[in-house]
A protein has these predicted regions:
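Conserved N-terminal beta1-alpha1 strand-loop-helix module at the mouth
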Residues: 9-74, 85-89
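Hydrophobic faces of well-ordered beta-strands that scaffold small-molecule active sites
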Residues: 31-35, 72-74, 104-106, 136-138, ...
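N-terminal active-site wall of soluble small-molecule enzyme domains
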Residues: 76-129
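Conserved anion-binding
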Residues: 114-124, 128-209
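Conserved small/polar residues in nucleotide/adenosyl-binding loops
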Residues: 215-222
Length: 227
């Protein structure tokens, strides 16, 4: 029963993600609170390093973010490490966030073949899913078009996605800044092609779209990587 939604809640959940996020940012500012129950954080805060500790820590962070942040982002692996108990803990935390009306992003960085990623829509975007979230993060390195199905499912359910384009980890630069040798964006960086694909999904939207990017602004000497 934990995942049940009223008709009013379901109507609100189906509204456009980009619009809801934009409205939340206008009300609370641009802050998105990352909820990442690392082992050391749990220890420092006096919680057990287990699924219950991760849940209690996350609930405390939710209470602090409520009414102060535009959204919260959960690091999926920090719950997955505890197996089924950790997933159940994340389900309860997501439910609590929905009850508070906080926009939720699950940072799962999923990706794969279209037949694989289509399952993610059932996990995160269906109205009665226990892991229902407002948005998830995706990896596009099977080809950005491999994500078309899950993106369309997200949009059809009023959800959003964040696609990794230009990330902060230095190890990613060799791939993300590589120059495409063929295809629609030949001569451009991989990051540019990903961003352009996302833009196509948002075409025609007024204001913020629902297909977003994970993008770290490059230093002045590295600005060419996004071109």
């Amino acid at each position: 029963m934990m995942s049940s939604l009223s008709s009013e809640e379901m109507s609100a959940q189906r509204s456009d993600f980009g619009l809801r996020l934009s409205n939340s940012m206008a009300q609370y500012g641009p802050l998105c609170v990352g909820i990442d129950p690392h082992r050391q954080l749990l220890t420092d805060w006096g919680y057990n390093v287990d699924a219950l500790g991760a849940e209690l820590y996350s609930m405390r962070m939710l209470q602090a973010a409520n009414g102060r942040a535009a959204a919260v982002k959960f690091q999926f692996s920090m719950f997955e490490r505890y197996g089924s108990k950790g997933i159940a803990a994340l389900e309860r935390v997501l439910y609590a966030a929905r009850q508070m009306g906080i926009i939720t992003i699950v940072d799962c960085l999923h990706g794969g073949l279209p037949t694989t990623v289509s399952a993610f829509a059932d996990v995160y975007f269906k109205p009665r899913s226990p892991l229902l979230a407002d948005a998830i993060t995706l990896l596009p390195y099977y080809g950005a078009r491999s994500l078309g199905g899950v993106i369309n499912d997200a949009l059809n359910n009023g959800r959003g996605v964040f696609i990794a384009s230009l990330t902060s980890n230095q190890e990613g630069a060799s791939l993300q800044t590589a120059i495409r040798q063929a295809g629609e964006y030949k001569g451009r960086t991989v990051a540019y092609g990903i961003a352009s694909t996302a833009q196509k999904f948002n075409k025609g939207n007024d204001g913020m779209g629902s297909v977003c990017l994970l993008y770290t602004s490059p230093s002045p000497r590295d600005r060419s990587v996004s071109r």
